[in-house]
Amino acid sequence: MARIKRGTNNRKRHKKVLKQAKGYYGSKHTLFKTANQAVMKSLAYSYVGRKRRKRDFRKLWIARINAATRMHDLSYSKFMHGLKVAGVDLNRKVLADMAVRDEKEFAKLVELAKNNL
């Protein structure tokens, strides 16, 4: 059986990792070992970040809705319950956007929620 050397495979793998590490600080973008560690860590961070983004945006939307409803003397939980009883099926993303961009329509929703409590 012929001897197989890994020169081309290693070069290809190293180039792939170093390409991913482009723009990293110091030796992390030039030395393979440190670049490989940095790339692995960054991939782990990006995976976690994609999960966290969903939580963070939901928290942001709730905070915005809460702030807007409290200006109309209503808490977030009572507002959401009032909307549910009224049969309004708008998600938090849309409600937060309305609270920021369209205050008059949001005020109507708050009144609707108050009337259905």
Swiss-Prot record:
Per UniProt, the keywords (alphabetical) are: Ribonucleoprotein, Ribosomal protein, RNA-binding, rRNA-binding
**GO annotations under biological process?**
ribosomal large subunit assembly; translation
The answer, when asked if Iron is one of the entry's keywords, is no
Gene3D superfamilies on file: 6.10.160.10, Ribosomal protein L20
Q: Name one GO molecular function term.
A: structural constituent of ribosome
Would you name any one GO CC term? ribosome
State the superkingdom: Bacteria
Family statement drawn from the similarity comment of this UniProt entry? Belongs to the bacterial ribosomal protein bL20 family.
Against HAMAP family, the record matches this protein to:
Ribosomal_bL20 (MF_00382)
What's its job? Binds directly to 23S ribosomal RNA and is necessary for the in vitro assembly process of the 50S ribosomal subunit. It is not involved in the protein synthesizing functions of that subunit.
What protein name applies here?
Answer: Large ribosomal subunit protein bL20
